[in-house]
Amino acid sequence: MKVFILALLALTATTAIAQLETTCSQGFRQYQQQQQPGQRQLLEQMRPCVAFLQQQCRPLRMPFLQTQVEQLSSCQIVQYQCCQQLAQIPEQIRCHAIHNVVEAIMQQQSQQQRQERQQQAQHKSMRMLLETLYLMCNIYVPIQCQQQQQLGQQQQQQLQEQLTPCATFLQHQCSPVTVPFPQIPVDQPTSCQNVQHQCCRQLSQIPEQFRCQAIHNVAEAIRQQQPQQQWQGMYQPQQPAQLESIRMSLQALRSMCSIYIPVQCPAPTAYNIPMVATYTGGAC
């Protein structure tokens, strides 16, 4: 549900920020030629946002240099599908379905890995999987989840297919908890979650009147990392790719961070920006 709310907010924001195409198209040549110390500090402070917007599991696709329709990331899609499918399985056979997921993942490992401490690894993997699905989906699963009944082959296959999104999500790089099969797993947030948290935290620490400038810095930094031939000539006024990158940056950060950003975000200027404490630690 949260995924759809974010998507709805993003689509709603599209209309509200249409006027950015004019106001955000100016000042990039000036930004390129002259950077104040405060601007450089803002860019450094927004590094987590740069990292997040370029991650594969970003919540919205950020097509710098290309005009594309906003869409949910593959991680969010499979997460939603996983929870939706799990909710449709009766409580009394959810344990069996989760056992099938564990088995399906373990079968994809090499023969040698499956032979080493298979029973212990499966038990630990089962525990981690239960914790992950419970936290992620908020769906009841028994704490002592044991395979309680034998099902027919057709039922087992149906359950396994029904929870395919869960298997996909748990093996994805941006899964909420790392579940290594069959090694001993360790709880840890993914890099995507860390940089998203850092990005929002850093953005919230920047005064409102300077957030437009900071977001311009993010878009500029990303654009400068593209191959020279892709962004050559981008600094001419009214370039569609330039406008689209700013518009998408504003839209994604507004939806993701729930932080006030002006609808008409002005172009960057060369004014001095006061020093802002930079957060350098990891996610809380």
Curated annotation (Swiss-Prot):
Residues 1-18 form the signal peptide. Expressed only in developing endosperms. Not detected in roots, stems or leaves. Contains disulfide bonds. The keyword Signal applies. SUPFAM superfamilies: Bifunctional inhibitor/lipid-transfer protein/seed storage 2S albumin (SSF47699). InterPro entries: Bifun_inhib/LTP/seed_sf, Bifunc_inhib/LTP/seed_store, Glia_glutenin. Keywords: Disulfide bond, Seed storage protein, Signal, Storage protein. PANTHER family: AVENIN-LIKE B5, PROLAMIN PPROL 14P. Seed storage protein. Might be integrated via inter-chain disulfide bonds within the glutenin polymer. This is Avenin-like b5. It comes from Triticum aestivum (Wheat).
